[in-house]
């Protein structure tokens, strides 16, 4: 009698366990096919798209397959592909959320799982749909500021070296040139007066009689 009861308990335990695992796991379903929101029959949409390209391009078909069969059925990792994806968009990130993991048929799975994905423009898509985003004011502004700084530094260096004091040039500085000419005239006048003074002193020295001492006396 004990053996019969034990066998019955084991039978019910295995049957209920298998039924529970079959009903609330996704390892029996290898792939999920997501269609557009227009063909949806349940309360919420199956496809949730985020990103700037969703308004112009929406993917009507997505096939997702989990890549670890019969391993951790409640924590499946899904790999999704979009066969009808345009070359102007690319999927950046995606994830699958299943509210009810009833694995009795493919239809029940597709009605209860939701695919969230983010759609971004590729280079060709931006060039076709958003060409103004390829041009930014930041590089031009930075280049303009660097050009102004380089021009200021070059002008300061040229002024320190005295290259901008030459007359009849487009960088002619009248004030600096006048000061330079005044200093040159002053220096030449001083040199002329100094030479005249030396010459006058020499002439006076020649005219003054010098007493001669006679040592024989």
Swiss-Prot record:
| Compartments where located | Membrane
Topology term for the membrane:
Single-pass type I membrane protein
- Residues with an annotated glycan are 84
Signal sequence segment: 1-21
Does Glycoprotein appear among the keywords? yes
Q: Mostly located where?
A: membrane
Keywords assigned = Glycoprotein, Meiosis, Membrane, Signal, Transmembrane, Transmembrane helix
The stretches that face the Cytoplasmic side, renumbered to this chain, are 155-217
Give any single GO term for biological process. Answer: meiotic cell cycle
Q: Which ranges of this chain reside in the Extracellular compartment per its record?
A: 22-133
Which parts of the chain are coiled coil?
Answer: none
GO cellular component terms, alphabetically, are: fungal-type vacuole; Golgi apparatus; membrane
TM helices/strands, residue ranges: 134-154
The molecule here is called: Meiotic expression up-regulated protein 29
């Amino acid at each position: 009698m004990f053996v019969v009861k034990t066998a019955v308990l084991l039978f019910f335990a295995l049957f209920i366990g298998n039924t529970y695992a079959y009903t609330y796991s996704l390892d029996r379903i290898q792939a999920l096919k997501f269609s557009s929101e227009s063909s949806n029959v349940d309360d919420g949409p199956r496809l949730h798209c985020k990103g700037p390209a969703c308004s112009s391009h929406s993917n009507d078909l997505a096939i997702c397959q989990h890549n670890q069969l019969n391993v951790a059925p409640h924590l499946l990792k899904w790999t999704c592909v979009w066969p009808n994806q345009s070359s102007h968009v690319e999927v950046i990130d995606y994830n699958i959320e299943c509210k009810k993991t009833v694995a009795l048929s493919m239809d029940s799975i597709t009605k209860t799982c939701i695919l969230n994905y983010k759609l971004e423009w590729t280079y060709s898509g931006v060039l076709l749909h958003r060409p103004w985003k390829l041009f930014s004011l930041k590089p031009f502004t930075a280049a303009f500021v660097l050009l102004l700084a380089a021009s200021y530094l070059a002008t300061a260096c040229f002024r320190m070296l005295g290259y901008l004091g030459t007359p009849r040039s487009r960088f002619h500085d009248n004030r600096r040139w006048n000061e330079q000419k005044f200093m040159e005239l002053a220096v030449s006048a001083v040199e002329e007066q100094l030479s005249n003074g030396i010459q006058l002193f020499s002439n006076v020295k020649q005219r003054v009689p010098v007493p001669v001492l006679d040592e024989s006396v």
